[in-house]
């Protein structure tokens, strides 16, 4: 089961996560039989309920901080945890709606295995002479305690495999530099008449995270483009590529992007 989850996470297998959303809606999770007879002759119905599945998805979304704004010191749109159709919601559709900063806080919690922080735009305030007036120490909002060690391992290994296998051509230079990046691509559908938003979230180093990020290209068609930006950010952050080579004043020619890619 561990390898199955890892593989599906790496390859963005919607069918697998549709099944997860469906099973969460069963009154006996993991048993897909609709009816069974008990020893006393009474029938127990194991039926699917979207409301039941949604309640479970909402529980974990709340734990990961997706029910609140991120804590930044600027106005921020309120998030929306999906309240419709657990099957679609399990792959991020439904009525899910989050700002990029809210996704950044979420992926930070994934990176550190469950500590949810309130974000801040500030590190510290100093006087003209350099004396610290106020230190913005990260504030812990809550901790996710009901995720198993094996689940964290599967998620982390799946995200690492995205960078080293699934989308390795994007991260060739970063991978060869010895910097271990973990990430996940995705597309967010706004409507049938708008191109999808391209997204990429990630953290590094994979085994001892120090930085986490979320990138969204509004109506950017493909997550490939967001992954390209993420790669450039990490190459700059870790000084893999000089700034003047990354900032060219023109858009990169990305030949691998496709409309609606995950």
Task: Give each language-model segment a name.
Residues 99-105, 225-232:
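Short amphipathic alpha-helical face segments that pack within enzyme cores
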Residues 144-145, 222-227:
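A short, polar/proline- and glycine-enriched secondary-structure boundary/capping micro-motif
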Residues 217-220:
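Ligand-site clamp/hinge motif
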Residues 132-140, 231-262:
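Short, gly/Ser/Thr-rich active-site loops of penicillin-recognizing serine hydrolases
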Residues 1-215, 260-262:
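Beta-lactam-recognizing serine transpeptidase/beta-lactamase-like catalytic domain environment
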Residues 198-204, 211, 229, 233-242:
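Membrane-interface anchoring segments and C-terminal beta-barrel signals
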């Amino acid at each position: 089961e561990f390898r199955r989850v890892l593989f599906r996470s790496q390859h963005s297998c919607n069918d697998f996560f549709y099944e997860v959303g469906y099973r969460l809606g069963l009154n006996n999770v993991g048993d897909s039989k609709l009816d069974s007879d008990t020893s006393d002759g009474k029938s127990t119905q194991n039926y699917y309920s979207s409301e039941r599945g949604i309640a479970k998805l909402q529980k974990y979304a709340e734990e990961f901080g997706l029910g609140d704004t991120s804590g930044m010191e600027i106005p921020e749109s309120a998030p929306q945890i999906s309240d419709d159709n657990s099957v679609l919601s399990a792959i991020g559709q439904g009525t899910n709606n989050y700002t990029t900063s809210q996704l950044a806080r979420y992926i930070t919690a994934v990176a550190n295995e469950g500590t949810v922080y309130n974000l801040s735009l500030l590190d510290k305030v100093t006087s003209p002479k350099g004396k610290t007036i106020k230190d913005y120490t990260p504030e812990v909002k809550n901790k996710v305690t009901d995720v198993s060690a094996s689940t964290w391992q599967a998620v982390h290994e799946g995200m690492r495999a995205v960078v080293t296998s699934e989308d390795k051509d994007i991260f060739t230079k970063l991978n060869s530099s010895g910097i271990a990046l973990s990430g996940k691509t995705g597309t967010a559908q706004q409507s049938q008449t708008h191109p999808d938003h391209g997204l990429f979230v990630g953290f590094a180093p994979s085994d001892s995270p120090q930085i986490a990020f979320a990138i969204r290209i509004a109506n950017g068609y493909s997550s490939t483009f967001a992954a390209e930006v993420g790669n450039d950010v990490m190459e700059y952050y870790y000084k893999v590529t000089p700034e003047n080579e990354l900032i060219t004043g023109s858009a990169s020619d990305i030949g691998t992007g496709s409309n609606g890619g995950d």
